[in-house]
């Protein structure tokens, strides 16, 4: 880009100038002061490219320019003040274009600005103090402006946005006031109905308040553990009114392992399994202060646990029980039990409805023999069901299939097993003869002499030629009970030649034993 040519982008001609900003601003200010700026469709007079964009120390050398540069340069036009040229003709000067009407001037001015991209933004950047007000803009008087401080909203760059916000706030206030006035009017018009509804509301409010007070009282009440339907009421445990003397005999029992609100759990440290205590046994500490009675014994016989219960929490805290403190028993006030029968009692954890004990008959087996018998019966039922399935006898609701044995071989007979090859062919099945065939054979014309035990074949019984008398003895070997042995194409051999002639060598009497 040539430095003496104007910048084609509006407002950026100062950036591509070789002169400093200070000198450029001075030059533009002098040119701007000599020209007259107007607000509406007026441009400064004597405005040219030479005195704006061309530096003073760098004159234009037309010899260095291209041939098309002079043709591309814009026509320099010096516009006179339009106010002085209202309707008269403007004379033409040397190398200057003059116009006779304001319309031609305006049209040429627009074309001039479009071609050379020169507008008032360059002048405004050079002279920030001078303002150029467009003709379409109308300023609002200062009296009509409302400051942001008075309204109470943050300041913005645009006055129009602030005015819109103010108008919206005023509309909201008026809408709320109208709704309040409308609601007050509705209340005044429906005063009679409101009085009736207030009375009904007051009654329901009282009931709700009572219910809330009751629920609050229940929540503030001390929580109690849950109970079943038929659970017995809490028992009042008495504390033994006994005072032990300093020389009273006591024996070590164990240590406290847990302290609850109204219970103390003691674990026995006695190695002897024969020493097990039952209820009503008095326990005490090493200083012979009474703890209370044993109320429950649980756990294994070798190392049982004992529970001492109290009626209130104050009684439990009064004995100063703590975990790990040794506990003793008084031999003269101990209630021992024999643990040997307890070894043969098999307990049950089963429970009935409402967590109650079930009947002994419904509990778990207490007799080993009865338990063994029940298990054997259960196994027998399973074995029977399995055999029914393996024998191709389908159970109700089950599929008919053949089970596999341990060797992964189906339960075929021994002569049908063919391991390592293709599975055996399907066996030929034939229904056995029934007694109903007897009546069928008697009523049949073709088979009137047929035995009722014969199969009813689709083809007639085969016929045979007569036999020679010499073969009568051998006919007995062929039983008539199995007609499948005879076929129509299989006929006995004819007798030898001359067998009927007594003089022939082949003649044999029927009485002769030719088999000898």
UniProtKB/Swiss-Prot annotation:
Give start-end positions of Low complexity composition bias. 178-203
Residues with the modification Phosphoserine, per the entry, are: 361, 366
Q: Which cysteines are joined by disulfide bonds?
A: none
Give positions of region: Disordered. 174-233, 413-439, 489-516
Record GO cellular component, one term = nuclear envelope
The record's Pfam families line, in alphabetical order, gives: Gar1
Q: Which GO terms describe its molecular function?
A: RNA binding; snoRNA binding
Which UniProt keywords are given for this protein, alphabetically ordered?
Nucleus, Phosphoprotein, Ribonucleoprotein, Ribosome biogenesis, RNA-binding, rRNA processing
Q: Does the keyword Amino-acid biosynthesis apply?
A: no
Gene3D superfamilies for this protein: Probable tRNA pseudouridine synthase domain
Q: Which SUPFAM superfamilies match?
A: Translation proteins
Which biological processes are named by the entry's GO terms? Answer: box H/ACA snoRNP assembly; pseudouridine synthesis; ribosome biogenesis; rRNA processing
Q: Which InterPro entries match?
A: Gar1/Naf1_Cbf5-bd_sf, H/ACA_rnp_Gar1/Naf1, Naf1, Transl_B-barrel_sf
Q: Where is the composition biased (Polar residues)?
A: 413-422, 500-516
Subcellular location, record wording: Nucleus
Provide the primary localization. Answer: nucleus
* Highest rank taxon of the organism: Eukaryota
Query: Subunit structure, per the record?
Result: During assembly of the complex, component of the small nucleolar ribonucleoprotein particles containing H/ACA-type snoRNAs (H/ACA snoRNPs) which contains cbf5, naf1, nhp2 and nop10 proteins.
* Family to which the UniProt record says this protein belongs: Belongs to the NAF1 family.
Role, per record: RNA-binding protein required for the maturation of box H/ACA snoRNPs complex and ribosome biogenesis. During assembly of the H/ACA snoRNPs complex, it associates with the complex and disappears during maturation of the complex and is replaced by GAR1 to yield mature H/ACA snoRNPs complex.
Name of the protein this chain belongs to: H/ACA ribonucleoprotein complex non-core subunit NAF1
Protein species of origin: Schizosaccharomyces pombe (strain 972 / ATCC 24843)
């Amino acid at each position: 880009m040539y430095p003496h040519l104007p910048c084609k982008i509006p407002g950026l001609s100062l950036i591509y100038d070789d002169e400093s900003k200070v000198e450029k601003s001075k030059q533009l200010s002098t040119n701007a002061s000599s020209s007259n700026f107007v607000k509406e469709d007026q441009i400064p007079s004597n405005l040219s490219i030479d005195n704006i964009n061309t530096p003073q120390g760098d004159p234009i050398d037309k010899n260095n320019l291209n041939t098309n540069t002079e043709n591309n340069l814009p026509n320099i036009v010096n516009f006179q003040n339009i106010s002085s040229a209202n309707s008269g003709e403007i004379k033409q000067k040397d190398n200057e274009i003059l116009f006779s009407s304001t319309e031609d001037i305006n049209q040429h001015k627009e074309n001039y600005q479009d071609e050379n991209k020169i507008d008032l933004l360059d002048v405004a950047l050079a002279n920030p103090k001078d303002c150029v007000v467009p003709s379409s803009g109308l300023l609002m008087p200062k009296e009509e402006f409302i400051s942001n401080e008075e309204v109470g909203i943050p300041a913005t760059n645009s006055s129009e946005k602030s005015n819109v916000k103010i108008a919206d706030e005023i509309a909201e206030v008026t809408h709320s006031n109208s709704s309040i006035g409308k609601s007050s009017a509705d209340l005044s018009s429906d005063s009679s109905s409101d009085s009736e509804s207030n009375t009904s509301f007051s009654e329901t409010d009282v009931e709700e308040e009572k219910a809330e007070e009751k629920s609050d009282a229940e929540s503030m009440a001390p929580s109690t553990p849950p109970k079943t339907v038929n659970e017995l009421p809490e028992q009042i445990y008495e504390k033994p009114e006994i005072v032990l003397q300093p020389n009273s005999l006591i024996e070590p029992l164990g240590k406290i392992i847990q302290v609850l609100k109204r219970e103390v759990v003691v674990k026995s440290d006695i190695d002897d399994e024969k020493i097990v205590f039952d209820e009503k046994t008095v326990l005490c500490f090493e200083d012979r202060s009474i703890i209370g009675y044993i109320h429950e014994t649980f756990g294994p016989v070798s190392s049982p646990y004992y529970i001492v219960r109290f009626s209130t929490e104050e009684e439990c805290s009064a004995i100063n029980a703590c975990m790990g403190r040794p506990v003793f028993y008084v031999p003269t006030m101990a209630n021992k039990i024999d643990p040997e029968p307890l070894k043969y009692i098999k307990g049950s954890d089963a429970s009935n409805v409402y967590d109650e004990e079930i009947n002994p008959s419904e509990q778990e087996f207490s007799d080993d023999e009865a338990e063994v018998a029940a298990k054997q019966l259960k196994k027998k039922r399973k074995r029977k069901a399995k055999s029914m399935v393996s024998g191709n006898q389908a159970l109700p609701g089950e599929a008919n299939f053949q089970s596999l044995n341990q060797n992964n071989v189906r339960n075929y007979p021994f002569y049908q097993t063919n391991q390592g090859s293709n599975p055996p062919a399907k066996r030929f099945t034939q229904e056995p003869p029934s007694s109903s065939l007897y009546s069928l054979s008697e009523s049949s014309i073709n088979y009137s002499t047929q035995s009722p035990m014969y199969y009813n074949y689709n083809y007639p019984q085969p016929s045979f030629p007569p036999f020679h008398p010499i073969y009568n003895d051998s006919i007995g070997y062929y039983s008539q009970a199995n007609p499948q042995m005879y076929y129509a194409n299989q006929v006995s051999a004819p007798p030898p030649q001359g067998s009927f002639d007594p003089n022939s060598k082949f003649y044999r009497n029927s009485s002769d034993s030719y088999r000898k």
